Amino acid sequence: LKPTAPYRSETRRQRYDKRATLAKTIPVSICAVNFGLDENLAMTIRSAVCYGAESVMIIGSKPPDSFLRPRSGTTISYINILQFSTPHDFLEHCRDRDINIVSAELCDEAVDLNDFEFDFDKKTVIVTGNEWVGVPAEIIHNSQPIYLPYCGKGYSLNTAVTSSIILSEFNRQYAIHNRITT
């Protein structure tokens, strides 16, 4: 899909509507765990839409669409949002549907994203945690934890940035997988 010219006569909504007819969906979702900054959820939604994710799952509170719409570049209208009250409810949803759970977390069991191979035999959800406390232990113990390697001075990335990087890697591996299997 080629980007459009910088000077447009159509509204953003018209451009998105047109692009939606050509867009593809890949078998991945993002789960945001009780984000402390609502803007991070909006940016995560935008990345999920751009990469073709099936849905954004939210554990905890969800700000009103009127808040998310302008901050997500209006992309909230183009993705399915699922909301869960607790990590247990989320895990039950994934178990019932046989969804792979991959969590972005800095923990001893985590695998370097560069060494991780996504399983495309079933759908995947990528969990990114709260900005201050991370992914709940209940989810970590029922998922494959991964981490993003970096050599700079920072210790961790913003949760919306993390989800975008992992979505990009999922998208890359999925494209290679489809070339090999088709």
Identify the role of each PLM range.
Residues 1-182:
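Post-transcriptional modification and biogenesis factors for structured RNAs
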